[in-house]
């Protein structure tokens, strides 16, 4: 069976709660602090591994406690770590401050993630049929090299174009087989407004604006409304599932990782999307990001 190879970010999430966030120059007393595993790359890799496929990761962590914890988390979830290099730069970190009204402020420090280089890609062998996944939390030049190498080896490339950036080179889009975006990212890259209640035809039209060559697929995740995929001449719609969401932090990452896993297992795109949609609907009922990813058995129990 083909494997999933993720080149991406690894973060430690530091979540703090307080009655209100501090003003400039002010110190306030916090209430709780929690540490979790995160980073879009880590989340997507763990989501894929929990669906029962072989997963290899390419990235960087620091020679620090957060790096040790990230490697242990990968190994506990069956993600291969041969492609993860240690560096003197700190492990990527996200500091999240949440006040009593649930409003949050987030500071993301890329740190070691910003040093992932094309040379790091050599640590993992790409084979025909492998699914290559990346996101915009490592250098764009590395993503481009990753996808060129993957397509040359007969792999399928999946780009989660998040977070939405202004410096994505057009040449990168051409090496993407499946592009996954949410409504905000879709509007950003298509140059049109895509409101949360946009009609399916409007979403599909915006998605087709992102295609750069024949054979590409654009998948738009639509939150509670599900997901929509378009090719040059076809369209797939997967309706959402009604659940009581408690934390949507890792929903998109869960969708991407689960989609990649099912494609590696031989599903056609519509079936893979349905599985990924159910997986994401489970993830939002749990607190956290990497820790919230469901197993294949949990997803299959709710699939019809």
Show which residues each predicted segment covers.
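Short, conserved phosphate/pyrophosphate- and ester-handling motifs at nucleotide-, phospho-/glycolipid
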Residues: 48, 182, 252
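Hydrophobic residues at beta-strand termini and immediately following loops
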Residues: 58, 107, 238
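Glycine-rich phosphate/adenosyl-contacting loop at the front of the ribokinase-like
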Residues: 1-60, 65-69, 75-76, 245-246
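Conserved phosphate-binding/catalytic region of the ribokinase-like
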Residues: 1-4, 166, 197-304
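Aromatic/hydrophobic pocket-lining residues that form π-stacking "cages" and hydrophobic walls in ligand
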Residues: 44-45, 70, 145-148, 279
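Short acidic/glycine-enriched loop/turn segments that link adjacent beta-strands
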Residues: 89-92
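Ribokinase/PfkB-type carbohydrate-kinase core domain
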Residues: 1-10, 72-86, 96-235, 298
């Amino acid at each position: 069976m083909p494997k999933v190879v993720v080149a991406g970010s690894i973060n430690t999430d530091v979540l703090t709660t307080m009655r209100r966030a501090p003003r400039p120059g002010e110190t306030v007393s916090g209430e709780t602090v929690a540490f979790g595993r995160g980073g879009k790359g880590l989340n997507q890799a763990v989501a894929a591994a929990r669906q029962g496929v072989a997963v290899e990761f390419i990235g960087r962590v620091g020679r620090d406690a957060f790096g040790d914890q990230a490697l242990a988390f990968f190994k506990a979830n069956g993600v291969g770590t041969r492609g993860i290099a240690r560096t003197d730069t700190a492990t990527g970190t996200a500091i999240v401050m949440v006040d009593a009204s649930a409003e949050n402020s987030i500071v993301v420090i890329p740190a070691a993630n910003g040093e992932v280089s094309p040379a790091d890609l050599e640590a993992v062998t790409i084979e025909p049929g492998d699914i290559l996944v990346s996101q915009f939390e490592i250098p764009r030049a590395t993503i481009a090299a990753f996808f060129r190498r993957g397509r040359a080896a007969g792999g399928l490339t999946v780009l989660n174009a998040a977070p939405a950036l202004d410096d994505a080179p057009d040449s990168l889009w051409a090496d993407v087989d499946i592009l996954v975006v949410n409504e905000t990212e879709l509007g950003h890259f298509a140059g049109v407004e895509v409101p949360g209640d946009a009609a399916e035809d409007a979403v599909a039209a915006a998605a087709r604006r992102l295609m750069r060559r024949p054979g590409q697929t654009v998948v738009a995740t639509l939150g509670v409304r599900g997901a929509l995929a378009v090719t040059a001449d076809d369209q797939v719609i997967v309706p959402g599932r009604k659940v009581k969401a408690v934390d949507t932090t890792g929903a998109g990452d869960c969708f991407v990782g689960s989609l990649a896993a099912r494609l590696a297992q031989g599903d056609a795109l519509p079936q893979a999307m349905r599985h990924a949609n159910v997986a994401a609907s489970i993830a939002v009922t749990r607190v956290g990001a990497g820790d919230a990813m469901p197993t294949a058995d949990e997803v299959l129990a709710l699939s019809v």
